[in-house]
Amino acid sequence: MKILVIGSGGREHAIIRKLKENPTIEEIICAPGNGGIAADAKCINVSAIDLANMVELAKNEKVDFCVVTPDDPLAMGMVDILEMEGIPCFGPNANAAIIESSKVFAKNLMKKYQIPTAGYAVFSDAQEAINYIRTENRYPTVLKADGLALGKGVLIAQTEEEAVQAVNELMVDQAFGQAGKQIVIEEFMTGPEVSVLAFTDGHVVVPMVSSMDHKRALDNDEGLNTGGMGTIAPSPFYTKEIADTCMKTIFLPTVEAMKQEGRPFKGCLYFGLMLTPEGPRVVEYNCRFGDPETQVVLPLLKTDLLTIMRAVHDEKLSELMIEWEDKACACVILASGGYPQKYHKGYEISGLDDYGQVEGVTIYHAGTAWKDGKYYTNGGRVLGVSAVSDTLEQALQLSYEKIKEIQFTDMHYCTDIGRKVVKQ
């Protein structure tokens, strides 16, 4: 059997390494992939958003099954096009991917179906948004670009001045292009934030192990928002009682709502949750595996991943019993200095073996290149150092211990991943 995984980051590397455990898979292709993924799959340099050439590649390679994970190709209809060519896929069609590609759609969906979330207002005019801010006068307040912005289109304003600046940045300067044509301004929620990825075939919802993402670039929750600087799983805040509440009030109602709207969702649905004093509420939806959440969730999966993905595609998820390791996992991201703003590429990475690994942990490659027998930095987030152990403390300790063996110029990482829940 031949599998195509579309994407080029640490998340795709984690999916590929998990798929490799299945002996019926003869070959895994990753497009475009990266230097480290090349040790585990055949990488072919076709952009994830080049729909025509990706379909051509899938047909030429006679691919049996395709996994589409990045948000852009999902929103553009990659799954629709591949399936029209008779290639079964894991991932939602464009009609359902709107749950992530439009924050306005997601907020309106939650309002209509009474799914708990923050109070909000939608604006397509900058001056109206500024007038609203001045009238409401509530801080902190959250401003979100409607469209996809690489996980960076959310701004938290502490003052009126910052809020007005955020509106101008999103709507006038168009920092994220068309993504900021409309914006959502919403109330600031408090409480621990938890990520729950879930498999769904449009009928049944099977949540994965919970995780906690650390989004800020610097220690002590400071610095700019990033795609994620580290993760732990499971979240100690996410109790069985909270999980049951989420299933009843959020997970099932969301999947049911999408069905009612004529947008049945099949794939991995990511729930970004805030455990507020009033109960769990939705911060955001993603229509795909999170990054770097995937790098801590999939290492704990016992059931074969391809079997699950095919059951999702065939709408037979109810027939599966999905099992997880009773362990903990931590992943610390090693980033290029300057990320998420300007950074240099092309620095040699030392400390990795020929397969891009370090003994005792799993290294997931996000932004790396392989050239003349050496690994080089090639992105903002470069590597994820992921460790599995019996406790979170041990997993974090192991990750940080092994980071000492890896070096590249201007290497940056947060030293306090998991500190909120673990006394290190």
List the model feature ranges, each with a label:
Residues 247-269, 286-358, 371:
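Active-site "cap" helix and flanking loop/linker of ATP-utilizing ligase/carboxylase catalytic domains
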Residues 38-41, 55-56, 98-104, 218-220, ...:
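Short, charged, surface-exposed secondary-structure boundary motifs
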Residues 21, 36-38, 60, 90, ...:
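Solvent-exposed alpha-helices and their adjacent loops that cap or buttress functional pockets
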Residues 1-94:
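ATP-binding N-terminal substructure of ATP-dependent carboxylate-amine bond-forming enzymes
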Residues 369-371, 376-424:
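Generic C-terminus detector
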Residues 154-294:
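Internal nucleotide-binding/catalytic subdomain
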Residues 4-5, 99-182, 212, 236, ...:
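Active-site nucleotide/adenylate-binding loops and adjacent lid/helix of ATP-dependent enzymes
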